[in-house]
């Protein structure tokens, strides 16, 4: 069965691409995240959408690599669970496509090898 979006009345929408405009998720990130966020306040709510595309911009000096991980929020336990991670080995613009399936997600910086770096990430849902 094809995955379809459900409207606010519980009625299936036609299986068409209905992407959102890009919105800011994180900006000015200049250090590895010390831990998971305390709550889901700064996360991306993907309710009603299957995928989330992160458009990631990385700048830096002495840059070798930067690793990000997708976190998934478990609302019953009020905890984050780690998903897949990806390592970038160059600065510039990168895209990361996440199979979110309606979850609440967060892009966490887990490692960096650079003298300095800055990360910004927009997201678009579809």
Annotated model-derived regions:
Residues 3, 31, 37, 43, ...:
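Tryptophan-centered short beta-strand motifs
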Residues 79-98:
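An anionic, turn-rich surface loop/hairpin at beta-sheet edges
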Residues 115-126:
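Exposed low-complexity, polar/acidic, P/S/T/G-rich flexible segments that act as propeptides
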Residues 1-35, 55-57, 82:
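Extended, low-complexity segments enriched in Ser/Thr/Gly and acidic residues that occur primarily
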Residues 50-56, 99-117:
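Noncatalytic modules at the cell exterior or secretory-pathway interfaces
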Residues 57, 71-73, 110, 124:
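A generic structural motif
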Residues 63-79, 120-122:
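Short, surface-exposed beta-strand/strand-loop-strand elements in extracellular ectodomains
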Residues 28-47, 59-66, 88-94, 111-116:
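Surface-exposed ligand/attachment interfaces on beta-rich extracellular proteins
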């Amino acid at each position: 069965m094809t995955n379809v979006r459900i409207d606010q009345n519980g009625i299936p929408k036609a299986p068409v691409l209905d992407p959102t405009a890009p919105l800011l998720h994180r900006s000015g990130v200049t250090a590895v995240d010390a831990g998971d966020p305390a709550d889901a306040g700064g996360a991306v709510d993907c309710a009603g959408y299957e995928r989330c595309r992160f458009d990631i911009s990385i700048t830096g000096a002495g840059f070798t690599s930067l690793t990000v991980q997708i976190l998934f929020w478990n609302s019953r336990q009020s905890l984050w669970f780690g998903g897949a991670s990806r390592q970038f080995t160059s600065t510039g613009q990168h895209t990361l496509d996440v199979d979110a399936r309606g979850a609440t997600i967060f892009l966490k910086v887990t490692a960096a090898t650079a003298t300095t770096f800055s990360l910004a990430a927009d997201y678009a849902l579809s």
